[in-house]
Amino acid sequence: MNPRPPPYQGGALPAEPHLQRSRSIMKRARQVNMQRKIEVAEIEEVLSTDRPFDSIIDVRSPSEFAEDHLPGSINLPVLDDVERSEVGTLFKQIDPFIARKKGAVLISHNIAKHIDTFIEKSKDWRPLIYCWRGGQRSTSMALVMHEIGWPVTLLRGGYKAYRKEIQNGLNQMILNTEFIVITGPTGCGKTDLLAEIARKGQQVLDLEALACHRGSILGAEPEKNQPSQKLFETRLYDALRNVDQTKPVFIESESSKIGDIHLPKQLFQSLIDARAIAVDCERAKRAQYSVERYSHLTEASENTESLIKQLRFRHGKRQIEEWVQFIAKKQWTELAESL
């Protein structure tokens, strides 16, 4: 028979062997956890002018990145659009466990390819990584980079945190900015004047450049697509963030829309309320300037005719027919004067 253990005399009870092993395992796990701890940055730190990051990496799919992204970021998707759709379908329609396994295979493969592009980076290289909301996609990439030894940082809340900052901060930036508006009819060189003002060292906000559009039915830029509404607002926010609010900002007058882009209501109202400088020149000179500036339309007359016909509800059948005749006869100066 085994002898009875001595009676309890007070003090700490001796730990059972299996409890000692369990505590040892937990201690080692905590140590590993501490070693793997990844730094997390708030959106305010990321947007600061002295942000300490060498690269900003967006690991979302290409279509998500194209819609909008943090300024200066590069797209290294851990799942492309097709893969993301495939994993999402598995998760919703088949089995979340199967979806996670499939996702792990795809993500691991893609991360390996991306890491190879950074193989020459020094150990001091500091990347910031984000996904949609700071979840599994960005954490997966960050964990691998962290284990390699790079001082990687995650954006808390991901792109959603950034978009919220845009929505909350843009109107206040607009209200805090003094605008001087350049007004005048089409063809009098407002955009050129704005560029000259910038060359003289003054602050300028070129909305048409941000929107990739010249602001009229004929204003689409050749071989350029307009950004999404979200990306335009990101560009606007980034431009205003770098403005010295103690000095005025020169801006060209615009309607409430530039192509498919809607100006924020507060910005449009600020343009209405701001001080204005009116410019003008002779009608013939404006027509000649327009023909030169919109030369891509004279080179693709079929496209120009299609655009002109979109104005029929505003100008009537007879006027449209006259403009179409100008196009057919390549009377571009007459068309510009009439428009």
What are these regions (language model features)?
Residues 180-199:
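Glycine-rich phosphate-binding P-loop
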